[in-house]
Regions:
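Non-catalytic accessory regions of SAM-dependent methyltransferases
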Residues: 1-128, 188, 255
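Short, well-ordered alpha-helix to beta-strand connector turns
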Residues: 30, 227-228, 249
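Residue-level signal for inorganic ion chemistry
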Residues: 47, 129, 219, 235
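Cysteine-centered catalytic environments shared across enzyme families
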Residues: 83-106, 132-179
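Non-catalytic substrate-recognition/targeting regions of SAM-dependent transferases
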Residues: 112-125, 146-213, 221
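Conserved class I S-adenosyl-L-methionine
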Residues: 227-237
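Conserved SAM-binding loop of SAM-dependent methyltransferases across substrates and taxa
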Residues: 238-250
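Short beta-strand element of Class I
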Residues: 250-256
Length: 256
C-alpha cells in the first residue's frame, strides 16, 4: 500500500483495537478486518478515518470505518492519514497514469478498481468520453470525498459527462441514503466505445453493473481467433462475444 505526501505522523481519530487474528490478517496484507475481530471501538462515526492497533496497542495503519458492514475496516494506509480527500485525489491520478501505459486499442476500461488501487469502495470506469462511478462505502460517500473524486476526474480526463451508478443493495447494507443512478456532472450520459475495433453503444444510465463487462475484453478477442462455422452467444447481454465472432463465423445467434 503506497505512502505519499497525504500521509504523515499526525494522528487520525478515533481508533480501533483488533484481536490477534485480526492483526495477523493485516500484517499478512489483507485489506479488511471483520466485526468479529474488533475488540475495542467507541463512538466512531460512520465512514470515519480510524487508527488501527493490535492487541498490544501497536499502530498498524489507518482504515476507513463502516458502522454497519461486517467488514468494519478497510485499510487505506500503513501510515497516518491527514487529509482523506487529498489522498483519494492523488490515488485516482496514480491509477489513471498507470493505465495509460497498459491500455491500448480501446477507449473502454476500468480506471479505479477499489482495493486494487488502494481506494476501497470506489469504482470508476471509462467509456470513451463518459465516466461511470460507483461508491460502495460510507467513507467514499462523504461529501468532501465525493467532491474530490469528481473534481479529479474532471481535471485529469476532461469527460463530457460523469454518471453515478447506484447499487441499492450495497447502499442499504452501508446504511446510506438511497439515490437514483444519475448524471453527476456534464451533459452526456451515453456514447460509443470500441473494444478490439468493434463499436458498442453505451448508455450510462442503463444495463447491469456499471454498464458493460469490461473484464471480458481480452476474452472477446481470444474467442474470435478460434471462431468458425455457426456460433451461439448465450446470455449475451450486449452481445460482446457475438459481435466479435460475427466476422469469423457463417452465422451467430445471440440469446439473452
Amino acid at each position: 500500500m503506497p505512502k505519499n505526501h497525504a500521509v504523515s505522523a499526525k494522528h487520525a481519530e478515533p481508533f480501533v483495537k483488533l484481536s490477534t487474528r485480526g492483526a495477523n490478517r493485516l500484517q499478512a496484507r489483507h485489506p479488511w478486518v471483520y466485526r468479529s475481530d474488533i475488540v475495542e471501538e467507541k463512538d466512531i462515526p460512520p465512514g470515519a478515518l480510524v487508527r488501527v492497533h493490535d492487541p498490544r496497542g501497536k499502530f498498524l495503519g489507518t482504515a476507513l470505518y463502516s458502522s454497519s458492514s461486517q467488514i468494519v475496516i478497510r485499510m487505506i494506509s500503513h501510515g497516518s492519514v491527514v487529509d482523506l480527500p487529498a489522498l483519494v485525489a492523488e490515488r485516482i491520478r496514480a491509477a489513471i497514469t498507470y493505465r495509460k501505459d497498459l491500455i491500448a486499442n480501446t477507449d473502454a476500461y476500468r480506471i479505479v478498481f477499489s482495493e486494487a488501487d488502494f481506494l476501497p469502495g470506489l469504482i470508476v470506469d471509462r467509456y470513451n468520453d463518459v465516466l461511470t462511478l460507483q461508491i460502495l462505502t460510507q467513507a467514499m460517500d462523504a461529501a468532501p470525498v465525493r467532491e474530490a473524486i469528481v473534481q479529479t476526474l474532471k481535471e485529469e480526463l476532461q469527460p463530457a459527462g460523469i454518471v453515478e451508478r447506484v447499487e441499492a443493495r450495497i447502499r442499504e447494507l452501508e446504511q446510506l441514503p438511497q439515490l437514483p443512478s444519475a448524471l453527476l456532472w456534464g451533459k452526456k450520459s451515453s456514447t460509443e466505445v470500441r473494444m478490439n475495433g468493434v463499436a458498442f453503444h453505451y448508455d450510462g444510465l442503463e444495463g447491469q453493473k456499471t454498464g458493460a463487462f469490461l473484464d471480458q475484453r481480452e476474452n472477446y478477442a481470444a474467442a474470435a481467433l478460434y471462431a468458425h462455422g455457426e456460433a451461439l452467444d448465450a446470455f449475451c447481454y450486449q452481445g460482446g462475444f457475438a459481435l466479435h465472432l460475427a466476422p469469423k463465423c457463417s452465422s451467430v445467434t445471440g440469446v439473452d
